Amino acid sequence: MPVPSRERVIELISELVHAQGYDVEDVVVTSAGKHSAVRIMVDSDAGIELDAAAEISRLVSELFDSLEEIGETPYTLEVTSPGIDRPLTLERHWRRARGRKARIDLAGETVVGRIGTLNDDSVAVVIGGRGGLTVREIALGDVQKAVVQVEFSKPSEAELELAGGIPEGRAVPSDAVDLTDDSGVDSVEDDEAELEDVENEEGFDK
């Protein structure tokens, strides 16, 4: 019997994940023959750390093992953060992305700016230009698509101050460093990616 659908997995795990202080942002279920892979993306206002990802993975694995609808189905389970480039579709996404640069598609124009304070039905966006920094209020209902951008340099203190700062527990976008790690393999490290793109490397294979 294959692992249940994405919708069913979300239904099964949401209460468990919420009890740990996290939200289920998405679930991806893929199958290859008799084996399935389940990738669960979770987040909170303070992001997610390795220990928390491992604990959620353990709890979900125990839950799956106890369900008749999954039974002895072989599967691999991974718990991770959604990553910084996921679309901003809910108010909590905007709140957690405060201080990050985003590409915001509106009707007839695209705005690139730093996400600021979230209000009842709008968000402040700090926009840089030849005349300096300005703050524009954008109605959430006017946003067609918004995606946080990967950054390789730190924003100015003035820009961050106008945006309202970075939420507690989140990292400030930083310079790309350590282009070569100790193993000699080329890599680019971003402090935000290190904090937010947390994966349970051990996973659970069943």
Curated annotation (Swiss-Prot):
Residues 164-206 are annotated as: Disordered. It is found in: Cytoplasm. The gene is rimP. Its main location: cytoplasm. Belongs to the RimP family. GO terms for cellular component: cytosol. GO terms for biological process: ribosomal small subunit assembly; translation. Keywords: Cytoplasm, Ribosome biogenesis. Pfam families: DUF150_C (PF17384), RimP_N (PF02576). This is Ribosome maturation factor RimP. InterPro entries: Ribosome_maturation_RimP, RimP_C, RimP_N, RimP_N_sf. Residues 178-206 have a biased composition (Acidic residues). Required for maturation of 30S ribosomal subunits.
